A protein has these predicted regions:
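Short, solvent-exposed amphipathic alpha-helical segments in soluble enzyme
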Residues: 18-21, 69-73, 147-150
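Conserved N-terminal subdomain of the carbohydrate kinase-like
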Residues: 23, 46-130
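Conserved beta-alpha-beta core of the PfkB/ribokinase-like small-molecule kinase fold
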Residues: 129-165
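Short, well-ordered, mixed-charge alpha-helical segments that flank or form enzyme active sites
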Residues: 11, 109-112, 139-143
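General beta-strand structural signal in soluble alpha/beta enzymes
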Residues: 3-4, 56, 78-79, 132-133, ...
Length: 165
């Protein structure tokens, strides 16, 4: 399985009694993990012992940190270099169980960045029967980004699943 999750993130999960806007808050705990819908799909594939490669943009120092965290989880990542820094997300988990997620948009990409991404997905599809496209795409990605990846899958005779807005 190839997982197209172009807009990776670093998630900072912050635990607190209650989120109160307009106040200075002290968190009870902080966990830093790689995130994004594609990473979640890769985790499920690993749990099911399904061979999978995640293809994502991994810009800057934060991209290098995410790449290391992804490897620490035993997930295979094909990182596509791009300028800027990887986006982050703040996940606030309250004692009540309520969750608030604040996502950054991700670094803007150019047309040639997306072309390199498509090439990485196409190359990764060799020997795989399924392409999963999951999560958001970075600013600057073509409006038909996932449609183009589905067409790549069709040319490779791979099934395609899209889970994105």
């Amino acid at each position: 399985m190839v997982i197209a999750g172009p807009n990776l993130t670093i998630d900072r999960t912050l635990t607190i009694d209650e989120l109160r806007l307009g106040e200075v808050l002290r968190f009870d705990g902080v966990a830093v993990t790689p995130g994004g819908k594609g990473v979640n799909v890769a985790r499920v594939a690993r749990a099911l012992r399904a061979p999978a490669v995640l293809v994502g943009f991994a810009p800057g120092r934060t991209g290098a940190a995410a790449t290391a965290l992804i490897a620490d989880e035993g997930l295979e990542l094909r990182a596509v270099p791009v300028g800027g820094e990887l986006r982050s997300a703040a996940v606030v988990l309250e004692r009540s169980g309520r969750v608030t997620v604040m996502n950054e948009p991700g670094p803007p990409i150019a047309a040639e960045d997306w072309e390199r991404y498509e090439a990485a997905v196409a190359e990764s599809l060799q020997g795989h029967a399924v392409l999963v496209c999951s999560g958001s795409v970075p600013p600057g990605a073509p409006h038909d980004a996932y449609g183009r990846l589905v067409a790549l899958a069709a040319r490779s005779r791979a099934a395609a699943i899209v889970d994105a807005r």
